[in-house]
Amino acid sequence: MQRYFARSKCNNEFILNEDDIYHIKKVMRMQNGDNIYVVYNETTYICELQNVSHNITVSIVKEEMKKDDFMPLVTLYVPVLKEQKMDFVLQKATELGVAEIVPIITERTLIKINDDNMDKKITRWTRICKEASEQSHRTTIPKIEKVVKISDIEAISNVNIVCSTSYKEKNVKYLLQTNKDCDTIGVVMGPEGGLTEKEEEALVKNGFERVTFGNRILRVETVPLFI
């Protein structure tokens, strides 16, 4: 059964986004009486479609399930990547339950973001996370924050780690296992080529702890899958 996030709710009916209405009509070619899942306020409902040929009516049949139980809440700091790699990271991070994604600019970031295209980028990234949430049956969509410089990142989670290419640091799995009861985790990823030593040291001063992936050097898009 198809799943969509509702824009708003009025009495016993939901209002969907225009893109989702188009998908129902033109892509899925659904008919009156077909059922879909609708997610609203972190709760999933089974709904029935009516008036599909005109202004779709989405009526609640029954409440199905409550919100996700992803714990701890993970904030992922992702360097701005080329479009295809960025899309992959956003999709997989969403599927794996990340709560918040903060795009960052580092010394080795190749893609530049300015005020003129930031809103457009965030809108696109949010859409990708929304579609990944629907596909993976989440009841929440990760929050996409505005792009920040790596120097502006602060350690606000219970556990704050920065992914290092050094073999001398603690293994990430060991650190997470010893903090398995924490409520929030902040993870800073590096771009292709990794973070500079200066950037890592600045994050450590701000409360982050360096971790390693053992003797492996991972592609940047593989990091969320490993953690």
Q: What kind of feature is each model-predicted range?
A:
Residues 152-156, 173-180:
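Short amphipathic alpha-helix with an adjacent loop that forms part of the alpha/beta core around
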Residues 1-66:
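N-terminal positively charged helical leader segments and presequences
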Residues 63-64, 167-168, 192-193, 215-218:
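Short, acidic/turn-prone active-site loops that include or flank metal/cofactor-
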Residues 197-227:
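Structured adenosyl-cofactor binding patch, chiefly the S-adenosyl-L-methionine
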Residues 36, 65-77, 176-183:
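Mobile, glycine- and charge-enriched loop segments
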Residues 67-161:
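RNA substrate-binding interface of SAM-dependent RNA methyltransferases
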Residues 182-202:
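A C-terminal functional module that forms or caps the active site or interfaces directly
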